[in-house]
């Protein structure tokens, strides 16, 4: 199964997040979703929205 370019991390993106290196701290009020479907030693962080 090959995903389309840019859609490699569907689970993370569905939650509105992006993959970051594991060392990055997700600063509140961002959410840290953990690894999700990001690559090894990365994690999914959702940056706070402007709403």
From Swiss-Prot:
| GO CC annotation, single | extracellular region
User: Mind listing the GO biological process terms from this record?
Assistant: envenomation resulting in occlusion of the pore of voltage-gated potassium channel in another organism
The record's annotation in InterPro entries points to: Myo_ane_neurotoxin_sf, Myotoxin
Keyword annotations for this protein, in alphabetical order, are: Antimicrobial, Disulfide bond, Ion channel impairing toxin, Myotoxin, Neurotoxin, Potassium channel impairing toxin, Secreted, Signal, Toxin, Voltage-gated potassium channel impairing toxin
GO molecular function annotations of the record = potassium channel regulator activity; toxin activity
Which PROSITE patterns is this protein grouped with? MYOTOXINS_1, MYOTOXINS_2
What intrachain disulfides are recorded? 12-44, 19-38, 26-45
A Pfam family cross-referenced in the UniProt record is Myotoxins
Write out the annotated subcellular location: Secreted
Q: Which family does it belong to?
A: Belongs to the crotamine-myotoxin family.
This chain belongs to the protein called Myotoxin-4
């Amino acid at each position: 199964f090959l995903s389309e370019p840019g859609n490699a991390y569907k689970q993370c993106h569905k939650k509105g997040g992006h993959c970051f290196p594991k060392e990055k701290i997700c600063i509140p009020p961002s959410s840290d979703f953990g690894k999700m479907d990001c690559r090894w030693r990365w994690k999914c962080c959702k940056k706070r929205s402007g709403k």
